[in-house]
Amino acid sequence: MKILIVSDTHRRNENYFQVIEQLGKLDLVIHCGDTEGSEYAISEGAGCETLIVMGNNDFFSKLPREIETTIGKYKVWITHGHNYYVSMNNEIIKEEAVRRGVDIVFYGHSHRPTVEIEKDIIAVNPGSLSYPRQEGKRPSYVCLLYTS
């Protein structure tokens, strides 16, 4: 199963469509929020199932604030992250993920890619394809290959 995880595209979808083309056939796209109204284009461009949550810039959106689902044997929580102060650090969101009993949390908001693997939780922020903030400011995403 090939899964693309993105966040914070902020209606600038050119890099997203390039990544979709480069990766080829996908089984799932997860968007961790801040589409700014372009969720239809993101879903249609994916060519597969798409899970999108609302970010702090998705005003008037009918997107869900959070999604809990499963991928294979893993319980997954998808959130934008702004309600868990991820711009400061990742401790609160990781604590909440453990409290919820999930294995993996996907989140965005900070525009900085991070992957943290700890005993109780895997926390993944794909960064931003449109407005990266990490050193070097390269657009980022995560491609997850899952085999059962």
Residue ranges and their predicted role:
Residues 1-49, 58-65, 137-140:
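N-terminal active-site segment of His-dependent metallophosphoesterases
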Residues 5-7, 28-33, 51-56, 78-80, ...:
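Active-site neighborhood of phospho(di)ester-bond hydrolases with catalytic His/Asp-centered motifs
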Residues 10-14, 36-40, 57-62, 84-88, ...:
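Active-site environment of divalent metal-dependent phosphoester hydrolases
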Residues 12-22, 78, 85-97:
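Pre-active-site segment of Zn-dependent metallo-hydrolases
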Residues 51, 87-142:
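Conserved beta-sheet core of the metallophosphoesterase superfamily
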Residues 51-56, 60-92:
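Helix-adjacent hinge/juxtasegments
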Residues 146-147:
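Conserved small/polar residues in nucleotide/adenosyl-binding loops
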